C-alpha cells in the first residue's frame, strides 16, 4: 500500500469523522497552533471514535489509516484497546487488518492481548486460511509463558492444516515458542520432523529455519528428506533457499568424504616433476587406494544448486557460492566466480559482503578470479570501504604476468583525493614488492619518488612501507636512508618520523656521519615530540652510544636525562632500562657486556600478509566471517569424515502415487542386450504371441485400411529398442490413433498382461511396414519432386531393416528356435541406422522441411531411458560454414567448419564439428594436426588424426568432437602444420548444442508443467501474418536451432523439443499465435542461460519478414 493511498485514507477518514460530528469547529484553537511543539491529549481520538462506530466502512478506513501509521514508523500502541475489540468482526477485511496490527503490538500489550485469547483460539478454526494463519501469528507474538500450552496445541494443529500457508506460519511459530520456553524442545522436534516431510515449497524454507534454530545437531531428521530438499530447492522462495543451502552445506560436510583428495594428489604430482621409478610406482599404488568416487547424493546437491547462481537475489547467489567453495571439487568451484562478479553491480552493502568473500577465496585460489581482474579496478564513485577491499583482491591476484598492469593502476590510485585510500594503495604496493621479488626494486624506487609528494600522509605512509622493504635488503640501499634522513625536518607524522629513526639506528654503522647529526637534531626537539618518536630517539641514542661513543656519549646522557623526567611512564621506564644496560657501573651485572648484541641484533623482515588470511576458518557468507570473530549462534563447519557414513539412511520408501509406474521400471531393468533373448523368454513368447497374432488379424479384418497407418507408426518403433516396453508403447500409440476404440482397449489389455507380448506386436508391425513401404515407393514416383525426395528418404530409412522382418515372419509360425538371430540382427542394424545422417547429409533444405517427412520422422527415435521422449534425426541440416582460419593468417592453409547435426562418434556428450582444410598455396603442407588446447574448465575435445600431407589446391574434411558443457564458450586450440602453429577459436551457436527429440503433445505439456518459474523465459513477437504460417515458423526455428517438431492439436500453437547434448536437459520451445500479428515465444528448460540465449536468437528471426 503506497503512501499516497495512506494520505487519501487519512483525508477520507477525516471526512467521515466530520460527518459523525467529531470535528467541533473549523477554526484553529490557540493550542492547535502549537500542535507541532506540544502533545495533544486528543491525539488519534477520531480514529478511536471510528473504531467504535457501527459502520464497517468507518472501521475499515480507520484500520487502513492505523496500518498506514505503522508502515510510516509512527507509534499506534495507544489504539490497542480500540483495535482489539474488533478482532471478532464479521467483516473479513477488517479482521485481516486487525490481525496485522495485533502481530505488531501483541508483545507490548500482553495483558490486553490475553483478554482476547479465546477469540484467537476460535480464529484458528476459521475457514479462511489467512485468518487461521494470522491468529497463530498473534498467539505466538504475545510471548507470555502462561500460554505456552495453548501455543503448543495450536502449532500441532496448524502443522496438520490443509493450507501450506498455515503450515508455514506454524514453522515460524516454532522458533518463537522455543525462544520463550526451551523446555518444549522435544515436542517441537516432533513437529519439525513432521513438517520436514511436507512436500510444499512454501513450507520447506520455514521449517528448515526452525530446524536450524531448535535442533541443528539432529542431522538424522534430514536424512530421509535430503533428496526432496535438493529437488525442491529451485522452487522454494528466495530466503528459504538461503537457509536450506546453508543447512545442506553443513550436512554435506558430515555425510560425504572430501572431494579434494583427488585434487591434492594432482598438485603433489605437479610439484614432484622429476621422480624415480620407485617413487612413481609407490604413488600409483597409493592413488589406487585413494581413488575417489563422488556420492550420487553429493553430486545431486551440487547439480541442483548450480542454476541458483543465476538468481536475482544476492543472498541466494552468495549461499550457492559458499556451498561450492566448501563442498564441491576444486575443479568445479570456478563456476561461482562469474556469478560473484555479477553481484558487484549491486548496491554498496552487497558489494562489501561479496568482496570480503572474494578476498578470502582469492588467497587460496587465484586462478578463479584472474579472468575478471578488471572487474576489481577501483571506480571514482566507490566508497572507501569498497576501494580498500578491491585493493586487497588485486593484491591477492597479483603475479609476474599482471604486476606491470597493476602497478600502473596503483600509480593512478596514489593520486586520489581520498587520503585513506591513497595510503592503503601504498601499503598494497609494499605487499606486491615483498611477494613478487622481480618488482621489489621497481616498487622501492617508486615509493622513494613518493617521498617528494606534497601530501604529508602519502609521504608518511611511503616511509613506513620503505622501512619494511629495506629490512629485506638492508645493505643495498644506503642512499635511500640518507635521503630519508633529510626528510626528518619536513615530515611531521609521528609514525613516519619513528620509522626513519629506527632505520637510521639499525644502519648507524653504514651512515656514521649522518646518524650523530640526526641524534643532535632530535635532542633539541625531544620534549615536543610524540611518545612514539621519543622511544625511537632513546633507541637511536643507545645504538650510537654502543657503536660511536666518542661523538655521542654526551648527547646520549643528555637525552637519557630528558627521558628520566618525562611525563609518560613508558618513556621513564625505558630510560632507566637503557641507562642500566649501556652505561657500565659497579652495580651493573654481566648483562651489560651483551648490550651491543641485544640492541643491534639482526631483526627478521616483517611479513606483509593479507588481513583475510585467517578468515577461512569461518563459513563464507556468515556474520562471523564478515566480523572476523565468532558471532553468537554461529554453527561451525565440521571436518570431512575419513569414511563416509552409511548412504542408505537417505533412501525413501516408494510412495503410493508412483505404483502405476512400477511395470515401466521393471521393463527397464530387463533392457540389457546380453539377456534379451533367453530360452525361457522364447517359451513364454510362443504362448502369448499366438494370441497376439489372432488379435492383429481381427483388427485387420475390421479395419483393412489400418495397415498403412500401422506401418508408418511402426517405423518409429524400429529405431527404438525392441526389447523394451518403451518402444512398443510408442508404436501402439501410433496405431491406436488410427484404429477404433475397441482395438485400443484390446491393445492396452495386452500391454498390461505382459510387456514381452508387445515385442511380438512390434515385429508384426515391422512386417506390415515392409509390405507398405513398397507401395509408398511406387506411389512416390507419380508425386511431385518435393514429395519424391521425401519418400526416397523414407524408403531409405526403412530399407536397411527390410531383410530382418522377412526372416522373422516364418520364424513366428513354425521355427521359434530361430527367432533368436533375426531380432538381434535387427537391433544391430537399427543401432547402425542411428548414424544415417553421417553418410547421407541433407543438402536441400526445402524437401527436408516437407510435412510428410516430419510426420514420419516423429516416430523415429533412439533407445533412451525415457519411454516417451527419444532422440530423433534432425529436421534440417544447415549448410552454412564458418571461417576457422583465414588463408592469409594460415600461410596458405584455410580452414572452415560447420555443424552437421549428427551424433558424435567419439562421445555422446560431444558436439560433432566438421572442419574443411584447404591448401591455397603452391606448396605441399605436411603434418596438419591439432596442437595445444586452451579449453575452459570442464570442456573436452577429441582431435582428428594428423593429416600427413595436403597437396596444393587440395581439400580434405575431418571431424572433431567437442564437449562444450552446454555453454557457448569458445574452444581455443592450435591448428598446426609441420612448420607453424596457428591459434584458432571455435564458438558454437546455441542452437547447435541441442539434439532433437520426438515426443507426444501430452508428454510435452507434462514436461512443460514441471519447467516453470525460473526455468521459463518468454517474449512477444510482432510480424506480418504471412510470416506466421506453419511452414515459415518451422523453417525459421529449425534453421536457428537443432529442434524436433512436436505434433500439435491446435493450429495456433507450434511446439519444438530437444535435449542439450552434454547434460540431456530438455529444451521445450513453444510458438503460440495470438490475435492480429503477434505471437508468444516461450522456452522452458533447466538450463536457464542457454534458454535465454536461444530466446534472443529466435526472437529476431521469427519477427523479421
From Swiss-Prot:
Compartment list: Cytoplasmic vesicle, Clathrin-coated vesicle membrane; Golgi apparatus
Ranges of biased composition (kind: Acidic residues): 679-704, 789-799
Bilayer topology annotation: Peripheral membrane protein
KW Transport (keyword) present: yes
Residue ranges with Low complexity bias: 705-722, 730-741, 775-788
Presence of the UniProt keyword Phosphoprotein in the record: yes
Protein name from the UniProt record: AP-3 complex subunit beta-1
GO BP, sorted A to Z: anterograde axonal transport; anterograde synaptic vesicle transport; antigen processing and presentation; antigen processing and presentation, exogenous lipid antigen via MHC class Ib; blood coagulation; cell morphogenesis; clathrin-coated vesicle cargo loading, AP-3-mediated; establishment of protein localization to mitochondrial membrane involved in mitochondrial fission
Amino acid at each position: 500500500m503506497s503512501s499516497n493511498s495512506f494520505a487519501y485514507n487519512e483525508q477520507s477518514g477525516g471526512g467521515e469523522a466530520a460527518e459523525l460530528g467529531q470535528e467541533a469547529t473549523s477554526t484553529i484553537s490557540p493550542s492547535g497552533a502549537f500542535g507541532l511543539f506540544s502533545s495533544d491529549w486528543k491525539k488519534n481520538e477520531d480514529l478511536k471514535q471510528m473504531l467504535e462506530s457501527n459502520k464497517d466502512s468507518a472501521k475499515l478506513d480507520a484500520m487502513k489509516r492505523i496500518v498506514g501509521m505503522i508502515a510510516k514508523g509512527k507509534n499506534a500502541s495507544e489504539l490497542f484497546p480500540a483495535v482489539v475489540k474488533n478482532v471478532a468482526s464479521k467483516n473479513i477485511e477488517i479482521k485481516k487488518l486487525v490481525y496485522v496490527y495485533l502481530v505488531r503490538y501483541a508483545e507490548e500489550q500482553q495483558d490486553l492481548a490475553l483478554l482476547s485469547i479465546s477469540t484467537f483460539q476460535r480464529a484458528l478454526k476459521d475457514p479462511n486460511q489467512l485468518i487461521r494463519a494470522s491468529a497463530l501469528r498473534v498467539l505466538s507474538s504475545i510471548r507470555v509463558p502462561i500460554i505456552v500450552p495453548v501455543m503448543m496445541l495450536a502449532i500441532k494443529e496448524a502443522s496438520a492444516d490443509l493450507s501450506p500457508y498455515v503450515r508455514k506460519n506454524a514453522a515460524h511459530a516454532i522458533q518463537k515458542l522455543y525462544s520463550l520456553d526451551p523446555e518444549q524442545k522435544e515436542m517441537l522436534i516432533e513437529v519439525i520432523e513432521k513438517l520436514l516431510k511436507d512436500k510444499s515449497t512454501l513450507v520447506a524454507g520455514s521449517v528448515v529455519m526452525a530446524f536450524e534454530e531448535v535442533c541443528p545437531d539432529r542431522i538424522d531428521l534430514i536424512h530421509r528428506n535430503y533428496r526432496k530438499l535438493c529437488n525442491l530447492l529451485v522452487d522454494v522462495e528466495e530466503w528459504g533457499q538461503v537457509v536450506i543451502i546453508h543447512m545442506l552445506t553443513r550436512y554435506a560436510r558430515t555425510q560425504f568424504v572430501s572431494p579434494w583428495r583427488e585434487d591434492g594428489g594432482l598438485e603433489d604430482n605437479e610439484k614432484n616433476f622429476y621422480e624415480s621409478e620407485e617413487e612413481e610406482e609407490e604413488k600409483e599404488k597409493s592413488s589406487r587406494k585413494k581413488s575417489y568416487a563422488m556420492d550420487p547424493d553429493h553430486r545431486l546437491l551440487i547439480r541442483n544448486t548450480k542454476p541458483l547462481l543465476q538468481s536475482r537475489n544476492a543472498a541466494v547467489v552468495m549461499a550457492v557460492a559458499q556451498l561450492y567453495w566448501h563442498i564441491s571439487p576444486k575443479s568445479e568451484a570456478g563456476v561461482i566466480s562469474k556469478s560473484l562478479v555479477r553481484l558487484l553491480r549491486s548496491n554498496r552493502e552487497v558489494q562489501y559482503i561479496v568482496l570480503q568473500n572474494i578476498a578470502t577465496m582469492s588467497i587460496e585460489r587465484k586462478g578463479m578470479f584472474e579472468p575478471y581482474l578488471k572487474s576489481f579496478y577501483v571506480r571514482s564513485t566507490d566508497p572507501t570501504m569498497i576501494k580498500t577491499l578491491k585493493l586487497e583482491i588485486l593484491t591477492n591476484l597479483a603475479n609476474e604476468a599482471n604486476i606491470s598492469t597493476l602497478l600502473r593502476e596503483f600509480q593512478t590510485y596514489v593520486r586520489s583525493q581520498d587520503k585513506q585510500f591513497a595510503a592503503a594503495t601504498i601499503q598494497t604496493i609494499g605487499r606486491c614488492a615483498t611477494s613478487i621479488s622481480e618488482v621489489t626494486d621497481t616498487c622501492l624506487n617508486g615509493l622513494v619518488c613518493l617521498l617528494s609528494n606534497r601530501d604529508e600522509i602519502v609521504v608518511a605512509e611511503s616511509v613506513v612501507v620503505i622501512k619494511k622493504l629495506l629490512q629485506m635488503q638492508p645493505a643495498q640501499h644506503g642512499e635511500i636512508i640518507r635521503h630519508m634522513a633529510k626528510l626528518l625536518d619536513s615530515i611531521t607524522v609521528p609514525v613516519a618520523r619513528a620509522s626513519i629513526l629506527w632505520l637510521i639506528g639499525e644502519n648507524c654503522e653504514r651512515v656514521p656521519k649522518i646518524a650523530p647529526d640526526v641524534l643532535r637534531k632530535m635532542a633539541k626537539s625531544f620534549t615536543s615530540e610524540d611518545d612514539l618518536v621519543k622511544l625511537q630517539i632513546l633507541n637511536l641514542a643507545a645504538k650510537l652510544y654502543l657503536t660511536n661513543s666518542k661523538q655521542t656519549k654526551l648527547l646520549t646522557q643528555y637525552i637519557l636525562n630528558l627521558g628520566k623526567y618525562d611525563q609518560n611512564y613508558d618513556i621513564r621506564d625505558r630510560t632507566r632500562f637503557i641507562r642500566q644496560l649501556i652505561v657500565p657501573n659497579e652495580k651493573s651485572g654481566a648483562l651489560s657486556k651483551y648490550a651491543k648484541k641485544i640492541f643491534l641484533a639482526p631483526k627478521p623482515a616483517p611479513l606483509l600478509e593479507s588481513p583475510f588470511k585467517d578468515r577461512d576458518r569461518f563459513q563464507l557468507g556468515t556474520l562471523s566471517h564478515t566480523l572476523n570473530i565468532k558471532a553468537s549462534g554461529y554453527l561451525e563447519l565440521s571436518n570431512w569424515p575419513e569414511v563416509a557414513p552409511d548412504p542408505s539412511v537417505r533412501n525413501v520408501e516408494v510412495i503410493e502415487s508412483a505404483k502405476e509406474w512400477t511395470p515401466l521400471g521393471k521393463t527397464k531393468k530387463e533392457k540389457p542386450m546380453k539377456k534379451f533373448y533367453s530360452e525361457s523368454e522364447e517359451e513364454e513368447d510362443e504362448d502369448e504371441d499366438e494370441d497376439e497374432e489372432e488379435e492383429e488379424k481381427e483388427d485387420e479384418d475390421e479395419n483393412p485400411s489400418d495397415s498403412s497407418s500401422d506401418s508408418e507408426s511402426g517405423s518409429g518403433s524400429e529405431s527404438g529398442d525392441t526389447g523394451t516396453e518403451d518402444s512398443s508403447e510408442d508404436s501402439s500409440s501410433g496405431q491406436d490413433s488410427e484404429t477404433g476404440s475397441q482395438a485400443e482397449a484390446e491393445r492396452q489389455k495386452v500391454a498390461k498382461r505382459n510387456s514381452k507380448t508387445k515385442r511380438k506386436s512390434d515385429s508384426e508391425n515391422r512386417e506390415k511396414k515392409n509390405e507398405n513401404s513398397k507401395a509408398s515407393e511406387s506411389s512416390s514416383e507419380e508425386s511431385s519432386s518435393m514429395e519424391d525426395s521425401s519418400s526416397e528418404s523414407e524408403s531409405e530409412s526403412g530399407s536397411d531393416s527390410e531383410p530382418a522382418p522377412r526372416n522373422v515372419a516364418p520364424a513366428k509360425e513354425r521355427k521359434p528356435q530361430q527367432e533368436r538371430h533375426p531380432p538381434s540382427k535387427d537391433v544391430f542394424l537399427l543401432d547402425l541406422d542411428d548414424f544415417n545422417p553421417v553418410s547421407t547429409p541433407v543438402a536441400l533444405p526445402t524437401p527436408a522441411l516437407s510435412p510428410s517427412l516430419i510426420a514420419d520422422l516423429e516416430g523415429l527415435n533412439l533407445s533412451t531411458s525415457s519411454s516417451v521422449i527419444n532422440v530423433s534425426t534432425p529436421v534440417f541440416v544447415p549448410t552454412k560454414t564458418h571461417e576457422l582460419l583465414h588463408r592469409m593468417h594460415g600461410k596458405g592453409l584455410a580452414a572452415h567448419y560447420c555443424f552437421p547435426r549428427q551424433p558424435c562418434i567419439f562421445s555422446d556428450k560431444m558436439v560433432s564439428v566438421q572442419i574443411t582444410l584447404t591448401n591455397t598455396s603452391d606448396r605441399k603442407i605436411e603434418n596438419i594436426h591439432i596442437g595445444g588446447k586452451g579449453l575452459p574448465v570442464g570442456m573436452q575435445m577429441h582431435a582428428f588424426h594428423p593429416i600427413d600431407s595436403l597437396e596444393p589446391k587440395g581439400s580434405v574434411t575431418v571431424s572433431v568432437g567437442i564437449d562444450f558443457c552446454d555453454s557457448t564458450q569458445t574452444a581455443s586450440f592450435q591448428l598446426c602444420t609441420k612448420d607453424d602453429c596457428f591459434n584458432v577459436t571455435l564458438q558454437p551457436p546455441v542452437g547447435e548444442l541441442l539434439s532433437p527429440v520426438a515426443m507426444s503433445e501430452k508428454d510435452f505439456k507434462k514436461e512443460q508443467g514441471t519447467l516453470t518459474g525460473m526455468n521459463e523465459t518468454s517474449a512477444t513477437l510482432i510480424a506480418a501474418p504471412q510470416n506466421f504460417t506453419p511452414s515459415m515458423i518451422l523453417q525459421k526455428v529449425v534453421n536457428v536451432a537443432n529442434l524436433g517438431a512436436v505434433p500439435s492439436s491446435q493450429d495456433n500453437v507450434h511446439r519444438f523439443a530437444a535435449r542439450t547434448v552434454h547434460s540431456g536437459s530438455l529444451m521445450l520451445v513453444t510458438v503460440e499465435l495470438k490475435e492480429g500479428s503477434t505471437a508468444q515465444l516461450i522456452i522452458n528448460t533447466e538450463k536457464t542461460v542457454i534458454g535465454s540465449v536461444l530466446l534472443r536468437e529466435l526472437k529476431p528471426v521469427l519477427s523479421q519478414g
